[in-house]
Amino acid sequence: MGFKSWITEKLNPGQRIIRDMEPVSHRTNRKPFTTGQAYSKIEILNRTANMVIDSAAECSYTVGDKYNIVTYANGVKTKTLDTLLNVRPNPFMDISTFRRLVVTDLLFEGCAYIYWDGTSLYHVPAALMQVEADANKFIKKFIFNNQINYRVDEIIFIKDNSYVCGTNSQISGQSRVATVIDSLEKRSKMLNFKEKFLDNGTVIGLILETDEILNKKLRERKQEELQLDYNPSTGQSSVLILDGGMKAKPYSQISSFKDLDFKEDIEGFNKSICLAFGVPQVLLDGGNNANIRPNIELFYYMTIIPMLNKLTSSLTFFFGYKITPNTKEVAALTPDKEAEAKHLTSLVNNGIITGNEARSELNLEPLDDEQMNKIRIPANVAGSATGVSGQEGGRPKGSTEGD
């Protein structure tokens, strides 16, 4: 059996059916204009999205050993790949901008695309990209703006979780912001109602009754007087004097400006946005030193790291190197210096690491002392302080019970 025949027999027989179910990927962010307006105008959405994007962009990547597998990008050296992922992806863009563009697409569109030209990495906007499935393998090609076709060995494809039309999707990712579009629209309608309510100069919850029959001219005159005397847009609020048998009473549930706050509903919408983006709400509301640190760690371990693992998995598949996220240089996860020093001191005194290794962990220069490069053997303070604990001490050798 030849190599090509072996490959043909190993292809997934069900791929043709999978391709027929979804021949071309579709955009899950179905209301991009609404999403864009919400990102630019709604504070909580802007803040949570930027927290995820900026936090993910702070993480670097570690390039490990090369796997013995067939990859799309051949001949790339470890140092070159490390430079592309951590210093400069291409001659025209810094690494922070590149990372933020990729994470933003993954967050808002559910997919991200990186173009590999053989020497550099370039971000390709996910909103304009389509994936065409293949009947035998996985992906046939990538189509950008219905004009440019990319081969599968030119695009690094990163896809978020998705469940479309009752089945998993291989080529479409689920936009995270799309899950809160309904909440954002309801929130916008509430605030628009409040704004129009005030702009129209409405008298809150007030209706006038009279036993007398007023003609059309008198009613219009009275309405004009009320609009002049009680207009929130102009700040008019004169004392209302009723005569001619007129009585005032509320006519709606909105009896004061406090009823227009929608505080509980707005808080519910804010919570939904935090849940969708995976941001602990305490990081936005503020807390104390006891709960801020655990929630920052929770945010990274449950939101940022899983997202970056999707990215590094695609990079590993494309380049063939073991690539992992590195959070060591993230300022928010830096351990307390005093606690770290005590921990390292304990490791040195118990013979786990050397003194200079501990200094290296603290970003200190090594000392030119022979003892600092040796493992310290702990003293047996419970016994005779010599030998191994449990094997020394007790009755002296050569003595008898009668001595």
Swiss-Prot record:
Ranges for region Disordered: 379-403
Basic and acidic residues biased stretches: 394-403
GO cellular component: host cell cytoplasm; viral capsid
GO terms (BP aspect): cytoplasmic icosahedral capsid assembly; symbiont genome ejection through host cell envelope, long flexible tail mechanism
Sites annotated Cleavage: 10-11
Oxidoreductase in keyword set: no
Main location: virion
Keywords, sorted A to Z: Capsid protein, Late protein, Viral capsid assembly, Viral genome ejection through host cell envelope, Viral genome packaging, Viral long flexible tail ejection system, Viral penetration into host cytoplasm, Viral release from host cell, Virion, Virus entry into host cell
Statement: the UniProt record of this protein carries the keyword Magnesium: no
InterPro entries in the record: Phage/GTA_portal (IPR006944)
Superkingdom, taxonomy of origin: Viruses
Residue span(s) of the pro-peptide: 1-10
Any single Pfam family the record assigns to this protein: Phage_portal
Subcellular localization, as worded in the UniProt entry: Virion
Biological function: Forms the portal vertex of the capsid and plays a role in governing correct capsid geometry. This portal plays critical roles in capsid assembly, genome packaging, head completion protein attachment, and genome ejection. The portal protein multimerizes as a single ring-shaped homododecamer arranged around a central channel. Binds to the terminase subunits to form the packaging machine.
Family, as annotated: Belongs to the phage portal family.
Subunit structure: Homododecamer. Interacts with the major capsid protein.
Name of the protein: Portal protein
Organism: Escherichia phage T5
